Amino acid sequence: MNGRLDRATVFVDADNTLWDTDAVFAESQLALLEAVEAGVGRRTAAADRLAFLRAIDQALAERHHARLRYPPRLLVRATELALGGIDGDSAARAAWRGGQTYRLSDDQAGDIERRFFETLAHAPEIRPGVLIGLSALEQAGCLLLIVTEGAKAKVERNAERVGVAQFFERIIEGPKAPELYRRVLSFTGAPARAFMVGDQLDRDITPAKTAGLRTIFFPGGFQPRWTPAVEQVRPDYTIASFDEVPDIVLGQRRATAAGSKA
């Protein structure tokens, strides 16, 4: 990557920033709930079925080092326990400890987990303003990089599916720590203007802000319950559509250029 000092670098998160991964997860989770209900012969009485399942989901994630990337079979087991009448936190705790007696066999649980992954592989929908925003940034000569903690191959596949792969010079896979941004910027020529666009305040905005980037918060549909408040993180900008990004990036670049000539 050969950068120029006056070239803006824009890091962009993938899931729930470029495309709506949350909707795919919701579809997968509701299908999992229905399969567990069918297997044990019980249904939740909760009016909001997705909220019922996601309470269990987040309780499991809080206990696992990979957070929301914990093995889905744990969700199958905890959901069965919750359908037996205990609350989501208690069900997650019991499934995590192990040693429980389940109605679903290991083969049944494995089949539900397999179908969960199959549904999770469905193509996501692109988020509002993404194509317009990326086109404008590309035409302005910005260096565009995807940064993700997910699997690079899956991000590449989804970028092709929604038609945005051609805008990005590189997909960077790794933990979103401040050091990652600093290291990449050293290769791009440490431009005066560097930005991060993301939907997660703790995973996208905070580390980028610590590294000195301008941060653009593009809220998605789902925020885990451990997410800090916007007022605590204080992103530089908050947008409702990705097509707002070019005005922010290019406006800041013009302001910097004017200041350097003063």
What are these regions (language model features)?
Residues 1-10, 107, 131-262:
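Asp-based, Mg2+/Mn2+-dependent phosphohydrolase catalytic module
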Residues 2-12, 17-52:
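Active-site neighborhood of HAD-like aspartate-dependent phosphohydrolases
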Residues 25-37, 72-80, 152:
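An amphipathic alpha-helix signature
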Residues 38-43, 85, 89, 163-167:
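Short helix-capping segments at alpha-helix termini
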Residues 55-116, 136:
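A metal-dependent, Asp-based hydrolase signature
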Residues 116-124:
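Surface-exposed cleft-lining segments at the edges of enzyme active sites
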Residues 123-127, 148:
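Conserved beta-strand/loop elements of the cytosolic catalytic core of P-type E1-E2 ATPases, chiefly
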